[in-house]
């Protein structure tokens, strides 16, 4: 199984990552900033070169005519490129850990300011991994905005609120698929069963006692520092 812990910065998703890593059958690697975004952009650029660009800008010049700026784009095998990208990601990014069930922490898919791009990136992940488990995590915008990464950013409350609501709406609408979990930091940080029970239900052999210890550490990067 493949999974991703999808959230936004300073929601406690590193605690979820550590909780998952107490199990003996699931492993979660840390975030790789913008990797999924750039992989998606690569594939989307090839699709655009093959379809929308010729149709909108050069409708009268065939793609097998070298007067066309996207000459021979129609011969690009998109499915093969996707398969190569997927294989490279599995082997060289996820493959750094040895586990039958591997996932990653993802904080860089943002509905702010463009929800359509975020939805497309989620769809891209589901293209790579059709049965992927999305573990979604949210946190109260006011509390989240006090942490160091947010408090000096303009419009941080609006961005956090937007991203939080996008996750909730996506969970309800099904863009993350039927196989997803919605967690709320403001609940599970006070009651660890709100974190433990959904992970166990997903098949993770986690150590509940260790998770209690991890949560109680109060990681500094999600505090008010």
Indicate where each model-derived feature is located.
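Mid-core helix/loop region of P-loop NTP-binding domains shared across ATPases and GTPases
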Residues: 89-94
């Amino acid at each position: 199984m493949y999974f991703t812990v999808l959230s936004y910065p300073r929601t406690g998703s590193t605690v979820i990552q550590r909780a998952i890593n107490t199990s003996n059958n699931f492993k979660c690697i840390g975030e790789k900033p913008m990797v999924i975004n750039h992989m998606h952009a690569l594939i989307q650029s090839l699709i655009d070169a093959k379809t929308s660009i010729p149709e909108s800008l050069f409708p009268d010049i065939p793609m097998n005519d070298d007067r066309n700026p996207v000459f021979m784009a129609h011969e690009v095998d998109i499915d093969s490129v996707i398969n190569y990208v997927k294989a490279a990601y599995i082997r060289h990014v996820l493959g750094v850990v040895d586990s039958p069930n591997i996932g990653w922490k993802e904080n860089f898919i943002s509905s702010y300011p463009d929800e359509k791009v975020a939805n497309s990136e989620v769809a891209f992940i589901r293209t790579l991994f059709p049965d992927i488990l999305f573990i979604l995590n949210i946190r109260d915008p006011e509390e989240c905005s006090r942490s160091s990464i947010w408090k000096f950013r303009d419009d941080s409350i609006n961005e956090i609120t937007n991203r939080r609501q996008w996750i909730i709406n996506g969970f309800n609408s099904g863009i993350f698929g039927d196989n997803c979990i919605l967690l709320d930091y403001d609940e599970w940080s006070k009651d660890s069963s709100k974190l433990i029970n959904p992970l166990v239900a997903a098949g993770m052999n986690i150590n509940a006692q260790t998770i209690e210890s991890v949560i109680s550490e109060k990681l500094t990067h999600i505090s008010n520092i």
